[in-house]
Amino acid sequence: AVAAGKHVFLAKPVAVDVPGCRSVEESGRKATEKQRCFLVDFQTRTDPFYREAVKRAQYGDIGRIVCGEATYFCGPTWGDQAKWLAEKPGDPEMRLKAWGLDRALSGDVITEQNIHALDVAAWVLDAAPLHAVGSGGRKARTAGTCWDHFSVTFTYPQDVLVPFSSTQLGDGWDDICCRMYGTDGTLDSHYFGEVSIRGRLPYRGGKIPGRYQDG
């Protein structure tokens, strides 16, 4: 598409491995050179409350950013895909159809879904993480090959640490959140809830009525 001079709109995951990510990155670079749009769909990036809060944090309203935290807690996902796999276990066509529960095809939950919370941290810091250390596992999920919990600490430039945790374990706490802590305040953002800043220069913020309808 880039070679043909077209605009590109991508949904996540843009890739599931390092070579794929590098290929997409290079395509984005070429699109910019050609003055073509190359956009990855994150609803938060078009949310006016997220945009204003991030802008204020980057302008220094929360002071020097010291650290952050991100979470993605929810129940099991891809229920229909789990049924398909149960009906035809080992069927190659069903594996492709149920890609969201396949680690090799989806990049696992942390790549395919959790990226919504992780992207906010990278957006606020305007940087990619330098390295990450963590683990996870699969103790409740029975369908597919994806894990059901993660715990990872990302290190950003200036030694800014952003610990991240994720679960998909039945009914319970449900929140997609990213908080960034500064010397003068805190940016508090919730994917399906309020976005605000508390501190020396507060921002009341708010939330849009429907994430998928309006995002």
Listing of model-derived features with the role each one plays in the protein:
Residues 157-161, 184:
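Glycine-centered tight beta-turn/hairpin loop motif at sheet-sheet or coil-to-beta transitions
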Residues 33-39, 44-144, 154, 170-172, ...:
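Predominantly a Rossmann-like dinucleotide-binding segment in NAD(P)-dependent oxidoreductases
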